[in-house]
UniProtKB/Swiss-Prot annotation:
The lineage of its organism: Eukaryota, Metazoa, Chordata, Craniata, Vertebrata. Keywords: Cytoplasm, Hydrolase, Nucleus. GO terms for cellular component: cytosol; nucleus. Signal peptide: none annotated. It comes from Rattus norvegicus (Rat). This is Protein N-terminal glutamine amidohydrolase. It catalyses: N-terminal L-glutaminyl-[protein] + H2O = N-terminal L-glutamyl-[protein] + NH4(+). It comes from the Eukaryota. The keyword Cell inner membrane does not apply. The gene is Ntaq1. Monomer. The active site is at C30, H83, D99.
Length: 207
């Protein structure tokens, strides 16, 4: 019965944005895509911004496998240096992941995303095990800054075309992306979790 209740709640969930296509999106700039999604949620008042989190996925080696990505929609994973998604923990106790690069539903119920896109660390070599820096959306909007220099090669050419809007910066910084990618709990904002800790903290099954 609990499973039926969760499914019913998920089916009644109203997404925080109209469609995937309505979101601001630039390939390979996932950190900015999610910042823009946080900004959209803040200005449209459908959900409290405090219910939403930016989630950076990386590890010490900057090699994290994620399945069901548009860059490789077959059975194999994409190995990213880092990836960023949005987590919404609704007042009804359901959690949803917004991943603009997945072939899974958008948004995707948390537990489905974990099962299909992240799978388990048990069968993954330790160097590939994922960690998660979870930052409240309001803090992310206030503190994140990027001058996009990480997307230029040694000759100063763009590896991927940058977004058309100006770089995101704060009064204190023009570039602090590495503080968000870092999985050192002593650095940056938010809290850092292992996969099992992340699931235990945010899984809809725990409500």
């Amino acid at each position: 019965m609990e499973g039926d209740s969760r499914a019913a709640t998920a089916s009644q969930y109203q997404p925080a944005c109209p469609t995937r296509d309505a979101c601001v999106y630039s390939s390979c700039y996932c950190e900015e895509n999610i910042w823009k999604l946080c900004e959209y949620i803040k200005t449209h008042n459908q959900y409290l911004l405090e219910e939403c989190y930016a989630v950076f996925i990386s590890n010490e080696k900057k090699m994290v496998p994620i399945w069901k990505q548009q860059a490789r929609p077959e059975n194999g994973p994409v190995i990213w240096d880092y990836h960023v998604v949005l987590l919404h923990v609704s007042r009804e106790g359901q959690s949803f992941i917004y991943d603009l690069d997945t072939i899974l539903p958008f948004p995707c119920p948390f537990d489905i995303y974990i099962e299909d896109a992240l799978k388990s660390d048990d069968d993954i070599h330790p160097q590939f095990r994922r960690k998660f820096r979870v930052v409240r959306a309001d803090s992310y909007l206030k503190n994140f800054a990027s001058d996009r220099s990480h997307m230029k090669d040694s000759s100063g050419n763009w590896r991927e075309p940058p977004p058309e809007y100006p770089c995101i910066e704060t009064g204190d910084s023009k570039m602090n992306l590495n503080d968000f990618i870092s999985m050192d709990p002593a650095v940056g904002w938010g809290a850092v979790y292992t996969l099992s800790e992340f699931v235990h903290r945010f899984s809809s099954k725990n409500y």
